[in-house]
Amino acid sequence: MHILLANDDGYLAPGLAALHRALAPLGRITVVAPEQNHSGASNSLTLQRPLSVFQATEGAQKGFRFVNGTPTDCVHIALTGMIEERPDLVVSGINQGQNMGEDVLYSGTVAAAIEGYLFGVPSIAFSQVDKGWTHLDAAERIAREVVERYLSDPPAGPVLLNVNIPNLPYAEVAGWRATRLGKRHQSQPVIRQENPRGEPIYWVGAAGDAKDASEGTDFHAVAHGFVSLTPLQLDLTDTAQLRSVRRWQTP
């Protein structure tokens, strides 16, 4: 078993080291992660300059390769020639903060998993809800359990799984739930400030609160102490509207 690890918080993030510890007993691990934090990078690729790859030589990250690019860059170059042996599984995370609802469209963590999926490799993204690493040991343990369950009882068809773990002690986690994506309200307004020259600058506002957190959603599961397991797909076609748009077709 060869597992490729990536993330969006950067190669020094505690969540990546925890994921490495969790999965190392399961097989050979290759880590290719961003040099810097790329939260919110989505599926962006670096096309205007070459990418450089470095290798950490000390600490918990010893042997990790890191790239001066995005999470998608990391998985893309790993799967298209940088590493010799094709991985059996791509795992991204453990992210600092949730990736639920529309978050998956912005998340670099989920994007790294999507890139693996696009290249035909089963892929799983892990996120721990809430900022901080208060119960990272619990998330580490759950990540290993989820991957072990995937290996022993894989779902039918291609796998792209988004996992959100509540920020709780392991003993307080209520269990696992298969979920759909919930929905958020619109993001908060931008925060306007001025730089020292009096020129306006803007910070992107906070994500909106949950709009659809009904039973069966990722929001609902996590709010009730469950691990949320959401299988994703990439076909964004609105099939319900397709018939209406066909009226616009030319002869």
Curated annotation (Swiss-Prot):
Catalyzed reactions per annotation = a ribonucleoside 5'-phosphate + H2O = a ribonucleoside + phosphate
Q: Which keywords has UniProt assigned to this entry?
A: Cytoplasm, Hydrolase, Metal-binding, Nucleotide-binding
Name the coenzymes or cofactors required: a divalent metal cation
Sequence positions that bind a divalent metal cation:
8-9, 39, 95
Give the enzyme's EC designation.
3.1.3.5
Entries under InterPro entries matching the protein = SurE, SurE-like_Pase/nucleotidase, SurE-like_sf
Compartments reported by the entry: Cytoplasm
Q: Which family does it belong to?
A: Belongs to the SurE nucleotidase family.
The protein here is known as 5'-nucleotidase SurE
Q: What is the lineage of its organism?
A: Bacteria, Pseudomonadati, Pseudomonadota, Betaproteobacteria, Burkholderiales
Q: Which gene specifies this protein's sequence? A: surE
